[in-house]
C-alpha cells in the first residue's frame, strides 16, 4: 500500500503520470482508474483514500443500493469523515438514505463536488474557501465558513418564565 507523496498533490495529470512512470496526452484533465468493488476498499488500497490530485477512482457497487451505502461507509472509515460526498441520482429515497447515514457535512446531489462544496448561487450554500467538517472531521462547525463566523456577537440574556416540562413530555414512552 502506498501513501500520499507531497510532490503529487495538486499537479497536472501529465506530471502525475510521469511520476508514476507513464505518459498521457497533453489535453487530458485527469486520470481515471477503476477501484473495483468493496473488496478493494481499505487502508491497504491506496486508491480508496483521499488523493488531493488529478486522479479519480471509480468504484462500482453490485446489487442493492444498500451495498453502495456500505461501501461509502467503508471508504469514509479509511479516508476520513466529515467533508463531503456526492450522488448523481433522481431517486429521492436513495438521496434521503445517503443523507441519513453519510458521516459528512455536505452532500452534493447531481452537481460537481469541487464546485458545489465551496458554495454557489445555484445551490444555496454560502461561498467559502474553508469548509467545516463537523465533529466527524475534528472541527467545531459543519458548514461552510463564511462572514457570520468572523463576526463577534454578544448575547444579552434575561430570565425567562420557567415552565418545566414533565418527564412524560420529555421522554414519552421511554419514561414508562
Question: Which ranges hold each PLM region?
Answer:
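Flexible, acidic loop-helix segments that line cofactor/substrate-binding pockets
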Residues: 1-17, 45-53
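Conserved C-terminal structural/oligomerization subdomain of aldehyde/semialdehyde dehydrogenase
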Residues: 21-176
